[in-house]
UniProtKB/Swiss-Prot annotation:
The gene is lon. This is Lon protease. Residues 18-38 have a biased composition (Basic and acidic residues). ATP-dependent serine protease that mediates the selective degradation of mutant and abnormal proteins as well as certain short-lived regulatory proteins. Required for cellular homeostasis and for survival from DNA damage and developmental changes induced by stress. Degrades polypeptides processively to yield small peptide fragments that are 5 to 10 amino acids long. Binds to DNA in a double-stranded, site-specific manner. One of its GO terms (cellular component) is cytoplasm. Pfam families: AAA, Lon_C, Lon_lid, LON_substr_bdg. Homohexamer. Organized in a ring with a central cavity. GO terms for biological process: cellular response to heat; protein quality control for misfolded or incompletely synthesized proteins. It comes from Chlamydia muridarum (strain MoPn / Nigg). It is an enzyme of class 3 (hydrolase). Residues 634-818 form the Lon proteolytic domain. Its EC number is 3.4.21.53.
Length: 819
């Protein structure tokens, strides 16, 4: 059964004859008593939310179900009384409730009227009469119980009368603050003569927002003084709450009123200014702003014609129209482009070289190219735009060198990444017909830098994508072509913009994924990975001082021993760049900062100083991440060490060969190690070449007769490809065939042809760095790469014995000196 107290229907499945029998028993008991005596046995209706109080009329919503039937029968009988009792728990399941889940004190109510409602439910009007106490359950199924009635002591004392006056006073105050029950309160107060303080207390408490437990406590209080005390406490709480709500409402109304007043005053002021000619309309304000910008710019005539047409159009449009907003935004972009504004060029070579050396260690090729650019600008009385592509592993300083170039040239710097970009509109802008259209990144760069000759860095150009929206790489062709970018056309502006004075710097990790037409427009400068000595210098001169400053530390607080930095580089940060090294330095300094603060809190007068050594480095960084790059301290039979390079830098590449009996009875070769197509072809070339030149290198020996040769490239989870492992594969097979190990500490790289010729390869610097890291001091490079090797700095070549070869015969003599 549901009511205004959210009472649910009980799962009773009523039997009409059983209920009628119970009613007859109650009627017989009533006949033996006086007509005005209330029934001693009542059906109990559980309530969930709030209890009712005597002296009130209350509506109750009853849904179709067992209790509806019971109440209907009660209404037709002479008894017409029912008990209303609160459940102990608000979420009690009233479908299967027992007397032990009900409070003992409730109220009796007379059924005045039952009004059916559509859907089978009904509205029951009850007159709440007396407090009752459940004395003894009579019938559990229908919650019928024997009850005792509480009769009020109607003796009125002066103290009770004073209490009553206090209650009425608080109710009147509530009436002023909360008009929700205004009519009911006025009727009650008009008929109140203060002769029944108990009824007054019950009525006042019923109007509050007190909790069900607080209300039940008042209902169970039979002593008049205690009940009125509790009622006064609840009323005062309600009064405080109403005052707070009233204060909040007044503040809100005051704010709204103030805002409305300001709005009306502003509108009046605007009207007065218009009448006096002091206020301009929106058209005039916008046009004045655009003209002010144009006066500071040297706008080409073709662009000025478009701007003038749009300004004429703007004057004819209503400011509230959507077309006005589109036209105004278009003019905003057209006039904010820094037409004719360029940064003054500086050609001080010494200062430029000083800035570059201060910001970066090494990178001599890059620094030389920037100095050449400045020199050309000085001689030509002006520096045209250039397109430079910096290629190298992550963390070697490609982005930071771009910022340094902008600083050297005294130009603004703008950077954006095209990694994963699939929409050409990001480059060339959206057409104005689209909602939310805006120019592309290049026009945005001009707006943000406010000059026509900024340094624009386009990052991650090797990771650019394409989709049905277009091909951003193709869109870049126009941008990066010196013959075309002076007439660059953005789709949104639809006006030619001169980008020929912009210095474009592109960055990439590898060149393989860059389309050839795009690559053809760039001047490629390679940034190789750093060796131990270079990383040590970078850490000492740049990373440690910068990180100390960020952490609020100084050289007096913490210092790194050079050996500690070497240990960190070799065992925790072995990547080609210095990004991980920088993070590890910061990690150490954060832990040092924590210790310093902890020591200061314990002993403020004591100054802490920490020295990072190889011994205590593990306390800050944990166990070393890397071990030696070398798989073998002494090279076994069938193993040759190659040199490779990836987007992450150089690496050693071991080629392992073993032979097992062939199931087919023929010589066969099998390659594993996630090799790519080109590397698979290299293994076939090595196999065929060795077979054809067997008498030259292993006279009298059969070529793996009845054996299957398994060639494996370790670290099988890493994809590998490229032709530069050709001579290494032949050397591994020869070592297996001759049963002779390859010269220890030998590393090699080179592409092999079927005739034994050794061709040039790429990544000489990276491979040299990998060889030094693995302590390989004898190296074999193709003769075609001698020039690349000669251009390397001396400190990279120090302590290495390098052989340049043109044919595999030369490789054989070096790899197998005793054969």
């Amino acid at each position: 059964m549901n009511s205004t107290n959210n009472t649910d229907s009980q799962n009773l499945d009523p039997n009409a004859s059983e209920v009628e029998k119970l009613l007859d028993e109650s009627a017989e008991a009533e006949e033996k008593t006086d007509d005005h005596t209330p029934p001693s046995e009542l059906f109990i209706l559980p309530l969930n939310k709030r209890p009712f109080f005597p002296g009130m009329a209350a509506p109750l919503l009853i849904e179709a179900g067992p209790h509806y039937e019971v109440l209907t029968l009660l209404a037709k009988s002479s008894q017409k009384h029912i008990g209303l009792v609160l459940t102990k728990k608000e979420d009690a399941n009233t479908l299967k409730i027992g007397f032990n889940q009900l409070h003992r004190v409730g109220v009796s109510a007379r059924i005045l009227r039952i009004m059916p409602i559509e859907g089978g439910s009904a509205q029951v009007l009850l007159s709440i009469e007396d407090r009752i106490r459940i004395v003894k359950p009579v019938q559990d199924k229908y919650l019928k119980a024997k009850v005792a009635y509480h009769k009020e002591n109607k003796e009125l004392t002066e103290e009770l009368k004073a209490y009553s006056i206090s209650i009425v006073s608080i109710i009147k105050d509530l009436l002023k603050l909360n008009p929700l029950f205004k009519e009911e309160l006025q009727i009650f107060l008009g008929h109140s003569d203060f002769t029944e303080p108990g009824k007054l207390a019950d009525f006042s408490v019923a109007l509050t927002t007190a909790t069900r437990e607080e209300l039940q406590e008042v209902l169970e209080t039979t002593d008049m003084h205690d009940r009125i005390d509790k009622a006064l406490v609840l009323l005062k709480k309600e009064l405080d709450l109403s005052r707070l709500q009233s204060s909040i409402n007044q503040k809100i109304e005051a704010t709204i009123t103030k805002s409305q007043k300001e709005f009306f005053l502003k509108e009046q002021l605007k009207t007065i200014k218009k009448e006096l000619g002091l206020e301009k309309d929106d058209h005039a304000v916008d046009l004045e702003k655009f003209m002010e910008r144009l006066n500071k710019r040297d706008v080409p005539q073709y662009a000025m014609d478009v701007i003038q047409d749009e300004m004429d159009k703007l004057q004819t449009l209503e400011t509230s129209s959507a077309e006005y907003a589109v036209c105004r935004n278009y003019l905003d972009w057209l006039t904010i482009v820094p037409w004719g504004i360029q940064t003054k060029e500086y050609h001080d070579l010494k200062k430029a070289e000083s800035i570059l050396n201060k910001d970066h260690y090494g990178l001599e090729d890059i620094k030389q190219r920037i100095l050449e650019l400045i020199s050309v600008g000085k001689l030509a009385n002006g520096m045209k735009g250039s397109i430079i592509c910096l290629v190298g592993p992550p963390g070697v300083g490609k982005t930071s060198i771009g910022r340094s170039i902008a600083k050297v040239l005294h130009r603004k710097f703008f950077r954006f990444s095209v990694g994963g970009m699939r929409d050409e509109a990001e480059i060339k802008g959206h057409r104005r017909t689209y909602i939310g259209a805006m120019p592309g990144k290049l026009v945005q760069a001009l707006k943000q830098s406010a000059i026509m000759n900024p340094v624009i860095m386009i990052d991650e150009v090797d990771k650019i994508g394409s989709s049905y929206h277009g091909d951003p790489a193709s869109a870049l062709l126009e941008v990066l072509d010196p013959e075309q970018n002076k007439d660059f056309l953005d789709h949104y502006l639809d006006v030619r913009v001169d980008l020929s004075n912009v210095l474009f710097i592109l960055t990439a990790n590898v060149l393989d994924s860059i389309p050839d037409p795009l690559l053809d427009r760039m001047e490629v400068l390679r940034l190789s990975g750093y060796i131990l000595e270079e990383k040590l210098q970078i850490a000492t001169k740049y990373l440690v001082p910068r990180a100390r400053k960020e952490m609020g530390l100084s050289a007096q607080n913490v210092s790194f021993q050079p050996e500690a930095l070497k240990h960190m580089i070799n065992n925790y940060a072995r990547e080609a760049g210095v990004r991980t090294l920088n993070e590890n330095i910061k990690k150490v300094l954060r832990k040092v900062a924590l210790k310093i603060v902890q020591n200061q809190e314990k002993n403020p007068s004591k100054k802490s100083r920490f020295t990072i050594t190889p011994k205590n480095l593990q306390d800050y960084l944990g166990k070393p991440i890397f071990s030696s790059d070398r798989f073998y301290e002494k090279t076994p039979v069938g193993v040759a060490t190659g040199l490779a390079w990836t987007s992450l830098g150089g690496a050693t590449l071991y080629i392992e060969s073993v032979q097992v009996p062939s199931s087919s009875g023929k010589a066969d070769m099998h390659l594993t190690g996630q090799a790519g197509d080109v590397m698979k072809e290299s293994s076939q070339i090595a196999w065929t070449y060795l077979h054809s030149a067997l008498e030259r290198y292993a006279p009298g020996r059969p070529f793996f007769e009845k054996s299957q040769v398994h060639i494996h490239i370790p670290e099988g989870a890493t994809p590998k490809d490229g032709p530069s492992a050709g001579i290494t594969m032949v050397t591994s097979l020869l070592s297996l065939l001759l049963d002779v190990p390859v010269l220890n500490n030998l590393g090699m790289t080179g592409e092999l042809t079927l005739t034994g010729r050794v061709l040039g390869i790429g990544g000489i610097r990276e491979k040299l760095i990998a060889a030094r890291r693995s302590k390989l001091n004898v190296l074999i490079f193709p003769e075609d790469n001698r020039r690349d090797y000669d251009e390397l700095p001396a400190y990279l070549k120090k302590g290495l014995k390098v052989h340049f070869v043109t044919h595999y015969d030369d490789v054989f003599k070096i790899a197998f000196p005793g054969v």
